């Protein structure tokens, strides 16, 4: 009788212990799944933050190049020669001679940066006529001859840059390049930076120096830093795609009867409110990012604003990484299987 009671007590103890182990294993599995999800989102966020740092360096490089070009002696020589009726009395050089020197400076900079598609000096006289212009055509860099130089006086980048202070820089929207009003095919997404150039003698605005940046080439290093089973995206401040692996989603604002954006693709994130918050740019809010696991869509998404225009601090681009939940779910399932096996061995 006592032996039977002992067996029953032992069996009861075993069942209680086994149940406790199973419960603990279940709780551990659940918590582990949540931790894995959180860890994946942290990795997404870190990836976007690293991309933002790299992007900032690229912008600093471009701004440095623009400043270098602006202060090159050849540019001052061109200005003096034009103001002197074709001859620079100060250094005894013709306008043509100075223009050749400036062309070589432009060429050197373009050779160092594959994403520069065009470098120009534009004067304000004669309707904003181009004075010196180099284009990247295929694999070569070409000087545009005088008869092909154009008037750009009505272009917003020229008008707005001409009104800036000496060291200020105008940043355009990222748009598709057009020739004679038509979008160039294949597409050439362009970002234009422009800064005013002043007559050293009178102090008046003489013209504008303009860099045309091929945006796809400019962002190539950024897109190469993407995590496994994820992709980078880049959008303007309205959430419209500039960079996306699905080409049909890009630059929908340039194409009639097409609408593609972050707001439409990820409605669960309530991005309209987020965009307004980022536009206000609360300096006390150092987070400036939005990270969500969208289980209904099977993805994790991290977005953050990239502020690039000191003259207009409300302007930003949106950097983002989107990752599939499939790998995360596989990792969680494998962990649960290991726990289940451990429970069986213990019990």
Where are these predicted regions, by residue range?
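Juxtamembrane extracytoplasmic/periplasmic/luminal helical "stalk" adjacent to the first N-terminal
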Residues: 5-10, 16-94, 111-115, 189-190
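A short, polar/charged loop-to-alpha-helix boundary motif
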Residues: 141-149, 216-224, 249-263
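Conserved beta-strands of PAS-like sensory domains
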Residues: 183-226, 231, 237, 242-246, ...
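Extracellular/periplasmic juxtamembrane segments that couple receptor/chemosensory ectodomains to their
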Residues: 260-338
